[in-house]
Amino acid sequence: GPQRIGQDVVIIGGGAVGCAVARELSRWQLDVCLVEQGEDVCVGTSKANSAIVHAGFDAPAGSLKARFNVEGSRRMEALSRELDFPYRRNGALVLCFEEAGLPHLEELLHRGQVNGVEGLEIVRGEQLRALEPALSEKAIAALYAPSSAIICPFGMTIALAENAAHNGVTFRFDTRVERIRRTQAGY
């Protein structure tokens, strides 16, 4: 028959978001269980993550996504040190190959500034080539976002899960959630 789980909080999914939620909730006096249909954490969508820590210049101005991009970018390096997973602030270049594309770079620059992204600038010529020497000669300009970074999605998700488990979160793997039913005691 169906298994019943009697915790204060049940998190469905052991990807990056589920493990981050588990880790955060593990700081509180709660009985937390993370349920994952796979055999381990980070076996679904998170394993195919691009690994980019977005600076926040491309999210719609003032949006929740922009806020989370900027705040996440600012906090990720400290989190990587705390939990010991790979992080590299290598910056990002949004390339422009023709004059007609320059207004788009200006738009991204403005959007990023509205969103609170620090250090954005449009670079050209020698400054652009100094940032990326192997760049195509056809590139005429770029938006440079020095706060963009990359992480190891596996390393981060595993580190979050390990910390959550150390703090008392229970993990149930190979467990599929088929139904959630409301009861007098909750769900």
Residue ranges and their predicted role:
Residues 26-47:
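Glycine-rich FAD pyrophosphate-binding loop
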Residues 143-187:
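Helical element adjacent to the flavin cofactor pocket in flavoenzyme catalytic cores
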Residues 2-17, 33:
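Beta1/beta-strand and adjacent pyrophosphate-binding region of the FAD-binding site
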Residues 30, 117, 169:
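Short phosphate-binding/catalytic loops that engage adenosine nucleotides
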Residues 44-51, 135:
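Short, flexible, mixed-charge acidic loops at enzyme active sites
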Residues 51-131, 140:
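Dinucleotide-binding Rossmann-like beta1-alpha1 core, especially the glycine-rich loop
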